[in-house]
UniProtKB/Swiss-Prot annotation:
Protein name: ATP synthase gamma chain
Organism from which the protein derives: Aromatoleum aromaticum (strain DSM 19018 / LMG 30748 / EbN1) (Azoarcus sp. (strain EbN1))
Superkingdom of this protein's organism: Bacteria
The keyword Transport appears for this protein: yes
Entry similarity comment: Belongs to the ATPase gamma chain family.
Amino acid sequence: MASGKEIRTKIKSVQNTRKITKAMEMVAASKMRKAQDRMRAARPYAEKIRRLAANLSQANVTDYKHAFLVQKDEVKRVGLILVTTDKGLCGGLNTNIQRVALNAMKGWDASGTTEIQACCIGNKGFGFMQRMGAKVVSHVVQLGDTPHLEKMIGPVKIMLDAFQNGELDAVYVAYTRFINTMKQEPVLEQLLPLTGEKLGTPEGSWDYLYEPDPQVVIDEMLVRYVEALVYQAVAENMASEQSARMVAMKAASDNAKNVIGELQLVYNKTRQAAITKELSEIVSGAAAV
């Protein structure tokens, strides 16, 4: 059995660890609320631009059809935008979305896909794709706690341009959707080509005045819509990250508290045994006299 001094040292070490995890839990809770606010603030813009894109894409103003709306007869070349975190200590968040991405890539390979290109948002996903030997054409890391579209759109645009130029037949995005504080869901969604289901049904019949012309307006609107989808995915993932980290750190703090209690019990028993032994020795010595 360990000595009382060794047990006290262990208790002190676990107490220090608990202080750290408790502080990280509180920081994550604060960041989670801010991330949720950003996520909710982005939703009205994404919904409004979706409605405009739906109306414009189905308006009979021109025979022109944007590349983002063209469905390919056969999908042989696939792009994947993988959204993960830059840091760990967030439970199984990254592991779950990486598993979804890996299963998707295996499925595409089994269906005869000849090429898979990846764009990684987040350090964890970038490292994962490198370990898997995937073809990573672009990546962005260290987005910080406040994602900016200007920083992430460069790497994402490489993927969008590849689709628009006919180098890819479909583009998917994998991220963790925020459900609530205790639940986050890893999802894989088709980003391109845009489907009628994704855009939704136009609200009535719309007539617009186009400046300078319909093609320019449609081109710009659809690109902005896809960018909004990517930003929303990143915002959802960041809210999920902070929620998962808060829960993970709370679990770590609770476990540390239990360990401290168990060690304290062992220490008390050790101290009691030592006192009993000393008393026995004193009594034995007195009896001998």
